[in-house]
Amino acid sequence: MKVIKYPAKEEWSEIVERPHLDVSQLNATVQGVLDDVKNHGDEAVKRYEEKFDHAHLASLAVTEAEIEEAEQLVSQELKDALHLAHHNIAAFHQSQKFEGKKVETCAGVTCWQKSVAIEKVGLYIPGGTAPLFSTVLMLATPAKIAGCKEIVLCTPPNKEGKVNPAILMAAKIAGVSKIFKAGGVQAIGAMAYGTKSVPKVYKIFGPGNQFVMAAKQQVSLHDVAIDMPAGPSEVCLIADETANPVFAAADLLSQAEHGFDSQVFFITTSEKVLEDVKKEVEMQLEQLPRKEMAQTSLDNSKFILVKDEEEAIDLCNTYAPEHLIIATADYEQLAEKVVNAGSVFLGNYACESAGDYASGTNHTLPTHGYALAYNGVNLDSYNRKITFQHLTEEGIRNIGDAVVTMAENEQLEAHANAMRLRVKSLK
């Protein structure tokens, strides 16, 4: 980890810069797989499953029998945890329901919005380095609450052609409609274009490696919407002298173990805390099963000493982290100054793990600085707002002349005429 003390503001842009990901070399490979899936459907998906996941599949669909079998394999302890997490996620997202109001913008002109669920959504759940069953809950629960009619889930099988039981259990709890054994680019292509087995969806959600991210971005250009652009996972932790170094180190390592390219950004106003956390990270790292991955991630990370909390929050807002932990005495006041972050964790007891699993907030968040302009997944991610307007004769009298004048000045005569005819009909 790189230690930086009292950096000048002119250095901040370089400090917050993420490792550059050159996906140009991936694009040709990704496009080739997408084209193959588009043209050859299930046959292409099965071929790539055999090539990449070493699974020979007779069928892509997960059966009811497989879901029932998975239910028997999941421990009661994990089932209880999944139900608790689902309850909290549902409660938080239920509170986000939109209530549109009719607004009379002037006499005779009424406007309103209606929230309508996206009918078909696709969820991608990676297999990769860990079975992300928590992401099933995060993506499927709000989709169900929003009222999406079809919730399609794709996830890679193991070599025996089986899907991780916890993923299937989470899918059942959250109300997923259909589950398919497909991973990587081929899964994104199947949901974007549709195959004989996999329905075409209108929007794709979910994390993945560089190939999956490149595939999502490519299909989003023409064929389907996606949740957001994404990069490697990251955390920023702001600490003062009241922070618990043991907790802080654990939080930083929980991010570092996500992947080799994850990033940790630690900002503190206390040199003692910086040194204490640094030592604690080194001690706790030795106990981790994913030590090598966490160590590689820490090599890309920065420990920064700043002069005061105002500078700390300004630097953090410049960084725009996916996760932000504020472990300071006045965390509530600092929280008011956060303008760029995906999800914020306040105080010594609000660890990132809580939000990753069971507090109720969504863990699908903007990374790689995208928090400057994007928010994380929420109920609105699964809805569209359709606007309505109704005009009476009085409304025509009130805005008709203005509409005609504006249309004429934009040299759109047909627009002007559509209103002009209505104005004349009232005279």
Language-model regions, residue ranges each:
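Conserved NAD(P)+-binding/catalytic subdomain of aldehyde/semialdehyde dehydrogenases
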Residues: G175-Q263
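Flexible, glycine/charged-enriched surface loops at secondary-structure junctions
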Residues: F98-V103, A225, S262-I267, Q287-S297, ...
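N-terminal Rossmann-like NAD(P)+-binding subdomain of aldehyde/semialdehyde dehydrogenases
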Residues: M1-E119
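A glycine- and small/hydrophobic-rich beta-loop-beta segment
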Residues: H258, F266-K337, A341
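Conserved small-residue-rich beta-alpha loop and adjacent elements
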Residues: V103-M169
